[in-house]
């Protein structure tokens, strides 16, 4: 279950950023998940709750957004978007000579904090 490892790394980054900004608590986190990242969102949600325990992010609200796959089609020389991992054909020319440009990871997009007074 690589979701646990991803969450552990995300919490490290979240804690680091929260401390740099003088946070006493992280209240919400927005993560973007790539369409081809092979991340199961329900597992990610469960693991995130576990790794947040006894951190500044404990009890925070997790918002997940599924990113579409951005690809380059070598057949028609177009930048295209794939909507699901099951469809690996260019929506423009139906070619299968695609290179994934962006979408295979997980990114911390935003976080809300309560600052110390």
UniProtKB/Swiss-Prot annotation:
InterPro entries: Hydgase_Ni_incorp_HypA/HybF_CS, HypA/HybF
PROSITE patterns listed in its UniProt record: HYPA
Keywords: Metal-binding, Nickel, Zinc
GO BP terms in the entry: protein maturation; protein modification process
Sequence positions that bind Ni(2+): 2
Family annotation (Gene3D superfamilies): 3.30.2320.80
Annotated positions binding Zn(2+): 73, 76, 90, 93
Pfam families: HypA (PF01155)
Annotated GO MF terms: nickel cation binding; zinc ion binding
Domain of life the protein comes from: Bacteria
Family that this chain belongs to: Belongs to the HypA/HybF family.
Function comment: Involved in the maturation of [NiFe] hydrogenases. Required for nickel insertion into the metal center of the hydrogenase.
HAMAP family from the UniProt entry: HypA_HybF
The protein's name: Hydrogenase maturation factor HypA
High-level lineage: Bacteria, Pseudomonadati, Pseudomonadota, Gammaproteobacteria, Enterobacterales
Gene that encodes the chain: hypA
């Amino acid at each position: 279950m690589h979701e646990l490892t991803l969450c552990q790394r995300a919490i490290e980054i979240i804690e680091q950023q929260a401390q740099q900004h003088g946070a006493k608590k992280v209240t919400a986190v927005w993560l973007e998940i790539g369409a081809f990242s092979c991340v199961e969102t329900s597992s990610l949600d469960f693991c995130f709750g576990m790794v947040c325990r006894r951190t500044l992010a404990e009890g925070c609200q997790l918002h997940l957004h599924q990113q579409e796959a951005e690809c380059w089609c070598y057949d028609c020389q177009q930048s295209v978007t794939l909507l699901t991992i099951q469809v690996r054909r260019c929506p423009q020319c139906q070619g299968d000579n695609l290179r994934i440009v962006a979408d295979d990871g997980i990114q911390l997009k935003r976080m809300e904090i309560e600052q110390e007074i």
